[in-house]
UniProtKB/Swiss-Prot annotation:
GO terms for cellular component: plasma membrane; proton-transporting ATP synthase complex. The keyword Ion transport applies. Produces ATP from ADP in the presence of a proton gradient across the membrane. The gene is atpC. This is ATP synthase epsilon chain. Belongs to the ATPase epsilon chain family. F-type ATPases have 2 components, CF(1) - the catalytic core - and CF(0) - the membrane proton channel. CF(1) has five subunits: alpha(3), beta(3), gamma(1), delta(1), epsilon(1). CF(0) has three main subunits: a, b and c. It is a peripheral membrane protein. Pfam families: ATP-synt_DE, ATP-synt_DE_N. It is found in: Cell inner membrane. The keyword Transcription regulation does not apply.
Amino acid sequence: MAAMTVHLDIVSAESKIFSGRVASLQVTGSEGELGIMHGHAPLLSYIKPGMARIVKQDGSEEVFYLSGGILEVQPSTVSVLADVVMRAKDIDEQAALEAKRRAEAHMANAGADFNYDAAMVELAKAMAQLRVVETIKKNIAR
């Protein structure tokens, strides 16, 4: 019996990153973790910066970093529209660590006109990239 799948498109502002049939998609929506599979109810949600994990039709997994965006689930198609999408293997761990350090330093030395919300967004993006890198390292170690 063939696995039940759904068509998934992951698109950034620059290009289509992934298009194909998947058994499942896991992302962090505005209300928490979302697991999308064949037969999921229609849904529209904001996506928080973080990891998107897909299980392809053949059972293999692929992991992406999403900087945020929108998830649309329809009966036969799932679309992820993200500002920035990076394959996990393309994330520069040192650059993410440096971005985290910079955001923390800005927050520690904040003045009266400091934009705390913008700093929190930058910190969240850096932390999300580092979580994706750690997930990949754990999967490789298995």
